[in-house]
Amino acid sequence: MPETKKIAVIAGDGIGPEVVAEAIKVLKRTEELFGYRFEFEHGLFGGIAIDEKGTPLPEDTLRMCQAADAVLLGAVGGPKWDNNPKELRPETGLLGIRKALGLYANLRPAVVFDCLIEASTLKPEVLRGTDLIVVRELTGGIYFGEKYRRDAENGQIAVDTCVYSVPEIERIVRRAFEIARQRRKKLASVDKANVLETSRLWRETVNRIAPEYPDVELEHVLVDNAAMQLLRRPASFDVIVTENMFG
């Protein structure tokens, strides 16, 4: 008898409940076809949690997620809460759960199927063969740095601090190299090393780790160029690793 896996379900806001309901149908079908066993527990999160419990990430929801084997999250936020103070914004709960669960690696695959290739505004010959994955660092950088405002002579000044440590960079870069090793063995590290000190540290760390993976081809791409190349030649990318804001 297979072990029952606990899944914490937090549908969230907007289209979230609709999407999550369909995902649960798929999971239940896998139970029937492959013999898996899932136990679903539901919790409030995001805007709906603010409305009902006064916080975007209730303690009982966080405990439920910490006790689960996996978390199934729908969508967070909406215009209704856009003008809330920072601590009462749905996105604050999202950052909180990422930090609390140590969710440092965000894996974003992008595959273009031939049957859908005409649905894009890009030419089919540009898109054909696209199969890439973006590995985004998720718990560091500008999203988690110190934020504040202060009064100045000509009005307020707002500050968002971008901070990265070597261990934070190392763990996401190694994860990306491992993923590339299992795929087509190509890794593009995206940064802004011509301007940002955090990006220079990022690039130095990537270069130091690269010899551990001699079978993986590495290239460095500045983020603005990466955006252009994803439109011009998306099929040339295999694995992309980058920091929180760029991902």
Language-model-derived ranges and their functions:
Residues 51-159, 245:
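N-terminal glycine-rich phosphate/adenylate-binding segment common to multiple enzyme folds
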Residues 33-59, 228-230:
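N-terminal beta-loop-helix "entrance" segment that forms/cooperates
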Residues 13-16, 69, 135, 176, ...:
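Buried hydrophobic positions in well-ordered alpha/beta secondary-structure cores of metabolic enzymes
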Residues 37-39, 106, 217-219:
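Conserved beta-strand segments of alpha/beta enzyme cores
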Residues 2-7:
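Extreme N-terminal starter segment of soluble prokaryotic enzymes
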